[in-house]
Amino acid sequence: IEAVRATGGNNAKRILIVQGPNTNIDLFVANNYMAKIKDSAADRLMVEVHFYDPYQFTDMSEDQSWGKYWLYWGKNNTNGAEAGRTADAKYNEDYVEAQMAKMKTNFFDKGYPVLIGEFGANQRLAIGKDAVHDASVKDYYKAVVTSAINNGCVPMAWDTNGNFPSMTIFNRASASVSNANMLEGIQEAVKSAKWPAK
């Protein structure tokens, strides 16, 4: 930080983003990272983490010796057609809320703006093939955005602009919506969130 400040000009007071270790919420909080940082500019730091929990639902591409990838996530999506593909209940909406609350307590409430610089979950099955998977993807996006906003965090969906399966919300080439599940989850969250966070 001081190396940037020392270059002068606008860098002396530029807002700098500090990423947590591995952009991980628990590592950021556990290490009390911001207490170790010194900045000559007052109130010119913000923090960033990414959120892809639980990995088995959001981004795991194939089964591993230690576990299977999950197709279904959330309190309302436990009755999927494929056995053994439902996320562990400990990672449902309550977990998302608890993680975002950690960012509020440890950073937002202490005056640091908070970015959830990336989040997302892969749509694994073709839209319309499995209604419970579709609902899981939508509910995940809604839960992350709702909890982030309500806890003072600015969430940014990671849009890969890729081929299925992916985290693609928009097709940039055709300027069209690729995944209504994701977009509608975000839109519903923005409407229901408590603005501004307190």
Tell me the role of every PLM-derived stretch.
Residues I1-K90, A101-A121, N150-N151:
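Active-site region of glycoside hydrolase catalytic domains
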Residues N24-I25, N92-E93, N122, F164, ...:
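Alpha-helix initiation/capping motif
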Residues Q99-N106, Y140-V144:
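A general structural detector for well-ordered alpha-helical segments in enzyme core domains, enriched
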Residues A126-K198:
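Aromatic-rich peripheral "rim/lid" segments of glycoside hydrolase catalytic domains that contact
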